């Protein structure tokens, strides 16, 4: 019998988890549970990552975590335990399925527009690294990482999801029209992997256009894959299409460890009242059962849930307000009483169990994700980010004194817009510039020469940050300033 780790969570977490586990027990789900300590009270005990060492060890030995909603203390400088868990165990893909649930009234259900949409979100990278700095008292910087290996992991998973779902179309949402290198890399890898799945129609859409289309015709989409921040926003938008986060399951998938959770809040205002809606956590649990190959029990529970919703049974947060609502325990018991019944709409077909054995890799060190470079990297200059409240021409005049016969000053930009050698007097400035130096003869240079340049520039300016201007062969690996 497979053993999994269970973290009940904060607020309403324990009561909805108990309700879901009671349904599992009634369905004779062949799982054993080891409860681990994670969440708000663990932070309060002084564990800055929101979990005890024993919890981490247990999860890393079992490979599956089933968790309720958790709270991160506000204003204490600690990271979200939810994000920490996903990143620590490299659960690189977040899968969220959104379907019309009969008995949950929405604008689209009333218009008879069916929704069967899957969002796959990259789960590790992007701005969610949380690498932020104040460069001056007025300027904050957040670094955004999009990597080729990380993109390939989540994109390949998304194509496999589409294949297993029987989808005909997979769409990449992006902002590559603006973020040409980061989102451009993600989009490039999307189409590279698409070549391996000729049976799927692969297309892309700019994310703002995607959002507009999703709230007007969500039935036109099947599987959508996005980078982390955009995927976070779009997946919550899609939850609103089917009734809210209370009906939105979530799975965080990694090569070794996977996490199944409800992504709604802890609802402390109703905690302990036994009135919370356990549907999202139950749907996440059903996804976990499928992941573990427990298909028979997953089908039994899902059909019973769908039948219960169709029958009009509801907790206080949804459903027909003219009929009495039930509490959390009563809702779970109603589902149990409906085992063996089929919903009128979209019943799930009976399946036979195909149990999956979770085998944890024995690692000698952290896996290094790296692809083969097309050519050797070379350095041809640097962007220096300097603090100054002087006018661009004054900054340029000072910088010109530090070229050392090797570099030329190419451009100065402010908030990404060029202000020297050309620009507009109507461009507002802040007290930090990006100044770009390139080798005078377009030849390669060394890191030591860049360090020497920085030493000279530091005589007049505080250097807040820097980036090398790399080439791969004849291809520049950096963007131009707006207006350059």
Residue ranges of each PLM-predicted region?
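Buried hydrophobic packing segments
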Residues: 20, 24, 190, 281-289, ...
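Buried hydrophobic positions in well-ordered alpha/beta secondary-structure cores of metabolic enzymes
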Residues: 10-13, 63, 120, 158, ...
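C-terminal non-catalytic interaction/assembly regions of soluble proteins
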Residues: 340, 344-484
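Glycine-rich phosphate/pyrophosphate-binding loop and the adjoining helix
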Residues: 54, 130-133, 139-172, 176-179, ...
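Glycine-rich phosphate/nucleotide-binding loop
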Residues: 44, 95, 102-103, 216-300, ...
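N-terminal glycine-rich phosphate/adenylate-binding segment common to multiple enzyme folds
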Residues: 44-141, 229, 233
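Glycine-rich phosphate/diphosphate-binding loop of Rossmann-like nucleotide-binding domains
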Residues: 5-28, 136-208
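N-terminal beta-loop-helix "entrance" segment that forms/cooperates
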Residues: 30-53, 212-214
């Amino acid at each position: 019998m497979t053993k999994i780790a269970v973290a009940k969570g904060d607020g309403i977490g324990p009561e909805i988890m108990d309700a879901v586990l009671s349904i599992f027990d009634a369905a004779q789900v062949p799982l054993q549970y080891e409860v681990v300590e994670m969440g708000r009270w663990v932070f309060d005990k002084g564990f800055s990552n929101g979990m005890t060492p024993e919890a981490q060890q247990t999860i890393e030995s079992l490979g599956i975590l089933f968790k309720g909603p958790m709270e991160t203390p506000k204003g204490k400088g600690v990271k979200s335990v939810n994000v920490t868990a996903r990143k620590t165990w490299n659960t690189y893909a977040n899968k969220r399925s959104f379907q019309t649930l009969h008995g949950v009234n929405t604008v689209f259900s009333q218009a008879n527009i069916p929704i069967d949409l899957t969002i796959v979100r990259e789960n590790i990278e992007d701005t969610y690294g949380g690498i932020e700095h104040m460069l001056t008292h007025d300027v904050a910087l957040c670094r955004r990482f999009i990597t080729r290996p990380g993109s390939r992991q989540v994109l390949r998973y998304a194509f496999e999801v589409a294949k297993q779902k029987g989808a005909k179309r997979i769409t990449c949402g992006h902002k590559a029209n603006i973020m040409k290198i980061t989102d451009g890399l993600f989009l490039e890898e999307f189409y590279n992997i698409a070549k391996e799945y000729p049976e799927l129609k692969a297309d892309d859409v700019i994310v703002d256009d995607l959002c507009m289309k999703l709230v007007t015709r969500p039935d036109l989409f099947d599987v959508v894959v996005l980078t982390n921040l955009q995927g976070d926003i779009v997946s919550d938008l899609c939850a609103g299409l089917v009734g809210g986060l209370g009906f939105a399951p979530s799975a965080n998938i990694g090569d070794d460890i996977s996490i199944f959770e409800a992504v709604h809040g802890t609802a402390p205002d109703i905690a302990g009242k036994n009135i919370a809606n356990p549907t999202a956590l139950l749907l996440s649990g059903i996804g976990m059962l499928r992941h573990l190959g427990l298909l028979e029990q997953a089908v039994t529970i899902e059909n019973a849930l769908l039948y219960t919703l169709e029958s009009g049974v509801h907790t206080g947060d949804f459903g027909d307000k003219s009929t009495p609502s039930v509490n959390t325990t009563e809702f779970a018991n109603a589902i149990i009483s409906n085992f063996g019944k089929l919903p009128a709409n979209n019943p799930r077909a009976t399946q036979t169990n195909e149990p999956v054995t979770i085998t944890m890799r024995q690692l000698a060190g952290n896996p290094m994700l790296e692809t083969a470079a097309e050519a050797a990297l070379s350095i041809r200059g640097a962007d220096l980010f300097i603090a100054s409240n002087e006018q661009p021409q004054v900054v340029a005049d000072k910088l010109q004194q530090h070229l050392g016969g090797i570099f030329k000053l190419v451009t100065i930009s402010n908030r990404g817009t060029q202000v020297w050698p050309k620009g507009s007097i109507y461009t507002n400035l802040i007290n930090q510039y990006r100044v770009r130096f390139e080798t005078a003869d377009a030849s390669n240079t060394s890191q030591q020469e860049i360090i020497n340049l920085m030493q000279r520039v530091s005589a007049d300016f505080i250097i807040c940050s820097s980036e090398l201007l790399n080439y791969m062969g004849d291809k520049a690996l950096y963007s131009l300033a707006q207006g350059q």
